[in-house]
Each structure stands twice: as structure tokens, then as C-alpha cells.
Swiss-Prot record:
Organs and tissues of expression: Expressed in early pancreas. Later restricted to beta cells. Undetectable in adult islets.
Location of the protein in the cell: Nucleus
Protein's name in the database: Paired box protein Pax-4
Entry GO MF terms: DNA binding; DNA-binding transcription factor activity; DNA-binding transcription repressor activity, RNA polymerase II-specific; RNA polymerase II cis-regulatory region sequence-specific DNA binding
Positions of the DNA-binding region: 5-131, 170-229
Domain of life: Eukaryota
Native source species: Mus musculus (Mouse)
An annotated GO BP: response to xenobiotic stimulus
CDD domains given in the database record: homeodomain (cd00086)
Amino acid sequence: MQQDGLSSVNQLGGLFVNGRPLPLDTRQQIVQLAIRGMRPCDISRSLKVSNGCVSKILGRYYRTGVLEPKCIGGSKPRLATPAVVARIAQLKDEYPALFAWEIQHQLCTEGLCTQDKAPSVSSINRVLRALQEDQSLHWTQLRSPAVLAPVLPSPHSNCGAPRGPHPGTSHRNRTIFSPGQAEALEKEFQRGQYPDSVARGKLAAATSLPEDTVRVWFSNRRAKWRRQEKLKWEAQLPGASQDLTVPKNSPGIISAQQSPGSVPSAALPVLEPLSPSFCQLCCGTAPGRCSSDTSSQAYLQPYWDCQSLLPVASSSYVEFAWPCLTTHPVHHLIGGPGQVPSTHCSNWP
């Protein structure tokens, strides 16, 4: 059989035309030899056709029963015709759980397509994606005028009516705990401020609350406890609340660049005399153990202890820092001893 085109020789010595399918008589011989029981490798050597070509022809014949080659030359004809596309959309609308290969089988069963002219699975999936995109675009166009249109106030609208949250923003409702839930959470907090995951799970099961809600409650409760402790500490030390925020150029702070004799004594603030109760609070000692050379003139200089992050008070050479007591002589900074009355408070073991 003479064919137009440039012929070539394969590895077995057979002639073929590049880009052209095998002749129909060769295909019939391949099928007849396979029906007689000859193996594909023996058919390939006998007819001098590549083993891959024999396998593809036999596989297509067993699968579809078609022996003729597919269309040659030009592009592949469109198998997804408008009628087929409409039926695919109808099947997917009626049975959303259908797979593409099930739709393909249904098209062949109904007779809309033959077995060799049915659209492939990838083509059906492509059609379904296009239909879904068109549908989503349609709904977007329907919603867009209502969203983009400006909201004009009505002359009969009530201006004093409360406004709800914006439709586009998410609003989280505040969790309201029952008395039993609040009591159980508070008992667990008194037992430990940082419960582990097991304790949180048990508490969530006991209070019928989500574990995330329990975790957030403990976080908020710890923050509330810190605020309460800070207020309690400031109430015990009335002068400490003013010393928490120290300005940059505070008259009570002596910078490192200043010489010892250049700081005037008026720059130091004058506070209240040292009371026995304050000495007992800071030192942890009895009032009788706090000795003073000048009992009527005991003055303190407030400053900030960076290690304990608590404002403490110092006398002439004493620093009231908790839990340890360290001494820093202040008379060296103000030009020598004797200018500030010495007040000594020792830490008893």
C-alpha cells in the first residue's frame, strides 16, 4: 500500500510513514494474530511493527471494539457539542456527586455519544469547571449592585436607633458564664493560675465550655489579678505610685556625668519622715530593731531599682529592696558625709 509522505524504517526493519497511522490491513492482521493467541511481542517481530504500537492498537480494540484509527490531519473535532454540554450540566445539577467518568458512561448509555466519540474525562471536568465559573460570575454580578450602591439615609429613618455591627465585619459575642461555671473556674484559678491541657480539658467538660473559652478566661483572669495586686501594692505604699514614671530630667535623679559636688542639696526631694510601720514593711524587722542616729530627721531619697522593677527607698546608705537588702552610700554623691542625716536600718537574719 503506497502512502504519501516520507517513509522511515523502524528498529525491526518495517516501513512506516511519520505522522500517519498503520494501514487498516495491518491492524486487522494484528487483531487476528492476537485472537489466535499470539503474544504482542511475537506479533511485533512477525509484522515488523513496534511493540508499543501493537499494544496500543490491541488495548484500544479490547476497550472500545474500534479498529479504525482516529482522525488524522487537522485538529481534533469538538466532541463536547452544545447538546452534550447541556446534558453534562443537567446531569451534574441533578446528581452533584457524579464523577466525570460516570457522566461519560451515562452519555454513551443514552446514545448522545458513541464509545469512540465520547468526550474524555478531562474534557468533562473542563466543561464542569467552566460552568461553575460562569455560575459564580453570574451570582457576583447579581450581588454587586446592592453592595456597590451608596446607602442613602431615609427621611423617615430613626436617627436615634442603635446601629448594629457592620455586615462586612465579624462580631464576636461576649461569653456569659453562669454562677456555677464562674465558681468552678475561680476555684481552679485559686488552685493554679496556669493549668495544663489535661486540667483545662477536665474543667471544660465539667463546665460544658469549649477549651478555648477556658484558656481565654484564665488569660483574662491572670491580667485582672495582676491589676489587683498592683493596686494593692500602691495602696500600701502611697509614695510609690508617683515614682513609677520617672521623667527624663527628674530633679531627684543624679546622672553619671555630674560630678559629686555639683549636685545641689535642693535637687533632692524631701519626703515624709521614716515611720516604724514603713521600716517594718520594707525591711521585715520590728520597729525596735531599726536604729536611727537622728530619729526626728530621717529623710529618704526615692529611686528605681532596675533589677526588682519596684520603686524602693533609700536613706543615707540603705536600699530597701526585696527580697535582699543591699547598701549604697548616698553621701558620696552629694559631696560627703554629714550633709544628710544618717539613718541606718539593718537586716536581721
